C-alpha cells in the first residue's frame, strides 16, 4: 500500500463548519488537541503498526477518533462520517452504505456499542 492521502486540520474544520451551517448546531471547536489527536490516529497507525492497517482500518480510525474524542461543540458524529467517507474517496474507495445504516453505525460508535475494529470490519466487509 502506498502512503494514503490524509485529511488535514483545515479541511476537517471546513467540513465541520459546513455541517453546522447547513444542518444547525453549536459552532466551534471545543478542544483543538482532541481534534489533532483524532486526525493523527490513522497516520500514526499507518507508520507504526506492523502489519500496516488497511484502508478500512484507517478510515475507522478517523471515524472512531472524531466520534469518541468529541473535539467540536456539536456535529462530531456527522464530522466523523464525513471524515471516513472523505478518506475513502481520497484513496480510491467509496462508502456505499445507506444514509440510515451510516447513521445507525456512527451512533453505535459514539455510544461505545461497537469497537474501532468492529467499525473497520463494517467498512471492509459490507461497504467499500
Residue ranges and their predicted role:
Residues 65-99:
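Mid-chain, well-packed structural core segment of small domains
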Residues 32-65, 69-71, 121:
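Helix-hairpin-helix/helix-loop-helix acidic hairpins
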Residues 1-15:
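Basic/polar, acidic-poor N-terminal "presequence/leader" segments
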Residues 126-128:
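Conserved small/polar residues in nucleotide/adenosyl-binding loops
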Residues 93-111:
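Short, conserved aromatic-histidine micro-motifs
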Residues 30, 34, 78, 97-101, ...:
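Alpha-helix N-cap and coil->helix boundary residues
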Residues 15, 19-26, 30:
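Core of compact, soluble alpha-helical bundle domains
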Residues 107-123:
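A structural-propensity feature for long, helix-poor, extended segments
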Amino acid at each position: 500500500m502506498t502512503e494514503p492521502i490524509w485529511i488535514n486540520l483545515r479541511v476537517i474544520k471546513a467540513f465541520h463548519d459546513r455541517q453546522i451551517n447547513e444542518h444547525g448546531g453549536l459552532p466551534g471547536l471545543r478542544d483543538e488537541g482532541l481534534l489533532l489527536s483524532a486526525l493523527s490516529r490513522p497516520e500514526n497507525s499507518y507508520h507504526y503498526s506492523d502489519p500496516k492497517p488497511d484502508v478500512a482500518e484507517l478510515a475507522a480510525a478517523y471515524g472512531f477518533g472524531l466520534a469518541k474524542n468529541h473535539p467540536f461543540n456539536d456535529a462530531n458524529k456527522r464530522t466523523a462520517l464525513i471524515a471516513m467517507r472523505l478518506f475513502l474517496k481520497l484513496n480510491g474507495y467509496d462508502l456505499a452504505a445507506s444514509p440510515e445504516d451510516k447513521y445507525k453505525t456512527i451512533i453505535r460508535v459514539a455510544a461505545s456499542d461497537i469497537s474501532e475494529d468492529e467499525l473497520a470490519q463494517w467498512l471492509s466487509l459490507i461497504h467499500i
